[in-house]
């Protein structure tokens, strides 16, 4: 049986799953900024807000301004909620 590649939202969930420990941190890694997510899941940076909008509305993801390592100004960073972590875990288990 051939396995299918996860969709963009699923890839974002799996990527952010590795960074749940940073949800309360003041400074966060570049990987959870828009550009970091875009690089990790192979999409254009301009497509990240569109890809995550449904996840924010469904309560799987939160967005906040944070200091990103290596960047002088605050940027939007994205974090999984408890529900998002559960969903990412179930996707990973597939």
Tell where the protein language model's regions lie, with residue ranges.
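A short alpha-helical element within helix-turn-helix/winged-helix DNA-binding domains
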Residues: 29-40
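Short, solvent-exposed coil/turn segments
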Residues: 27-30, 71-73
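Short helix-capping/hinge SLiMs at alpha-helix to coil transitions
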Residues: 18-29
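Short alpha-helical segments that sit at the start of domains
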Residues: 1-19
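Amphipathic alpha-helical dimerization/coiled-coil segments
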Residues: 1-4, 86-94
């Amino acid at each position: 049986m051939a396995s299918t590649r996860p969709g963009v939202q699923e890839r974002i969930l799996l990527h952010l799953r590795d960074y749940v420990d940073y949800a309360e941190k003041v400074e966060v890694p570049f990987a959870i900024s828009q550009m970091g997510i875009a690089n990790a899941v192979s999409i254009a940076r301009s497509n990240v807000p569109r890809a995550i909008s449904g996840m924010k509305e469904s309560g799987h993801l939160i967005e906040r301004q944070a200091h990103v390592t290596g960047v002088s100004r605050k940027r939007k960073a994205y974090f999984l909620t408890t529900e998002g972590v559960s969903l990412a875990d179930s996707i990973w288990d597939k």
